[in-house]
Amino acid sequence: NRRWARLAVFICSLFVGMGQIEAQETYHTQIYKPKRIKSLQVVQPDQTFTVPVISLGSGEQILINFDDLTPNYERYAYSVIHCDADWKKSSLNELEYMQGFQGLTIDDFANSFNTTTQYTNYQLLLPNDDVQLKVSGNYAVRIYHEDHPEETVLVACFSVAESEVGIEAEVTGNTLIDTYQRHQQVNFSVLKKNLNITHPQTDLKIRVVQNNRPDNVVRKIMPSGILSDRIVYENLRELIFPAGNEYRRMEFLSSKYNG
């Protein structure tokens, strides 16, 4: 039986007409002022270890949380940027992907209390009453000081999904490299539902991400099989990930038996 993989598998198939401009900045979650800004988190509220993905129109929100190592409130502002499948700014203008205003300040903050180092914690929830998202895709939130908008303080990235296709996936220790040792194999199928996928090699943009890590994203994945109702990606060498000790299986079996 197949199970949903704990390894995040993102199917970026709906970036139609969102052009990519060469030499554009590639966005990823990053602190640009590391001596001052700490503890950046981009999560769903009350779900610290989840991948930052919400469903379009579901009422779900993304929480952007960070600390500033100063005791005073700073007027941090934010802008929301719609990105393509490669996390570059898409060709959509603001009116097409959001309803609301850019450059609003982050007013949800709290000062530290009885701590060795004084700091101020800031929180931003998106979407909110001032900013609504109209389309699915990848989003980058650029945060900067209101008095210095040209200087980026941090970038927080998340995705908004639509259930246009289904995904069945599994992670197994039985790989082409070894069996239940140091690697894991990801297999998955894209269920077409009612979506017309004529040429999956070009119609689908697949990204496989291990534990939300930006450093080993697998791209340009070709299917191993094309069926009437699904596109299959199985036993592909590029979908084998080093697992290490954290993902090894342990067998609690005794070697002692009664004679």
Which positions does each model-derived feature cover?
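Ligand-binding face of N-terminal immunoglobulin V-set domains in extracellular IgSF glycoproteins
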Residues: 118-146
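Bacterial Sec-dependent N-terminal signal peptides
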Residues: 1-25
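Contiguous beta-strand segments within globular domains
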Residues: 33-82, 178-192
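Short beta-strand elements
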Residues: 149-169, 259
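Low-complexity, Pro/Ser/Thr- and charge-rich linker/hinge segments at domain boundaries
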Residues: 26, 31, 160-183
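Aromatic sugar-binding surface patches on proteins
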Residues: 105-108, 113-127, 227-253
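Extended low-complexity, serine/threonine- and proline-enriched intrinsically disordered segments
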Residues: 72-100, 198-221
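Short, aromatic- and glycine-rich surface loops/edge beta-strands on solvent-exposed regions
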Residues: 78-80, 137-144, 238-259
